[in-house]
Amino acid sequence: MCEFITGGGLCAAPLPESLAKEGALMRDALLHDLSRLPYSVITTVDARLNVPEHCDECVIAHANDDIWRIWQAQIKLADAVFLIAPETDGTLHYLTQMAGLEGSLVLGCGLASIKVSSEKMATCLALEAAGIATIPTYTLDNWPKSHWIWLAKPNDGAGCSDTACFNNADDLQDWIEQNDKQLTHVIQAYQPGDAASISCVMRKGKAHLLSCNTQEIEINNHMLSYKGGVINGMREHWQAFELVANQIAKALPDLAGYVGIDVIVDNDEVIVVEINPRLTTSYVGLREATGKNPAELIIKTLTQPRFKWPKLQQNVVNFHV
């Protein structure tokens, strides 16, 4: 099991506390769930952090180590690989490709869907082509600049990272130009409604819902930040979320394993913001929310074609990051 941030992905660079905290939450929850299953689990950890519990072996990554060689060596030892990594700079795509080349079973999405969902512009185009409601996405060259609230986001960013919001087009353009974001960022109009997310498991064009969640997003000095949410805080929208998740699964059929979908709910319309082809922070509350071991559900869905999806509890769980 590889969690990029805590597992040594930044071993030769500064380790931001917020990223390490969020990564550790996902890592520890997944390791706990995997430890309840009949597998030996190996992982890696940045030398600046404590060795995690619930693993059979942990390789420590120091600042002078080649972390990619370490991961490649561990992948060679494994029968299956669970990857948690940001889409930014192609990191998740590269790790997934590495695991595939070593012949390991990747308990996650395929390369094609990772490539599309890693880029906001490509995601928008794929969703629009499939007739799925989404937020129109522009570059600085084709942006309409109408009177509205606008957001600038990294085209390949994850979550709220480096995302700015301004009440008028001129201020947003000034921010983009002053911070040299012309080539890295795309522009979206602010979409009114309730920020939410879908946690689900996908395989071969079919989606199974784990939970329907609210998201807590803060805006401070024009910059967005993610603070957590409520697992199943949107359970009244289960049927609508399930429909959207299955539409996405059909549009991108090699989405596999855990997939997180960020959405806006506006007067019962579900508008897709982005697709996360990997574990999201919502995973930390899923064991309590579902009454099941989510890691077991993911593995059985991917490895047992006739696996019958069980009835899940829909408990409400608060979490913060």
Task: Give the label of every model feature segment.
Residues M1-L19:
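Nucleotide-activated donor-dependent transferases that construct or modify glycoconjugates
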Residues P14-L34:
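Short catalytic helix/loop segments, enriched in acidic residues and glycine
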Residues I42-K145:
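Conserved N-proximal alpha/beta basic substrate-recognition cap immediately N-terminal to
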Residues Q188-P253, V265, N276-T303, N318:
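ATP-dependent carboxylate/phosphate-activation module, predominantly the ATP-grasp catalytic core
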Residues L255-N267:
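A short glycine-rich, hydrophobically flanked beta-strand micro-motif that places a catalytic Asp/Glu
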Residues E269-I271:
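Conserved protein kinase catalytic/activation segment
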Residues P305-V321:
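Cysteine/selenocysteine-centered motifs that mediate thiol-based redox chemistry or coordinate metal-sulfur cofactors
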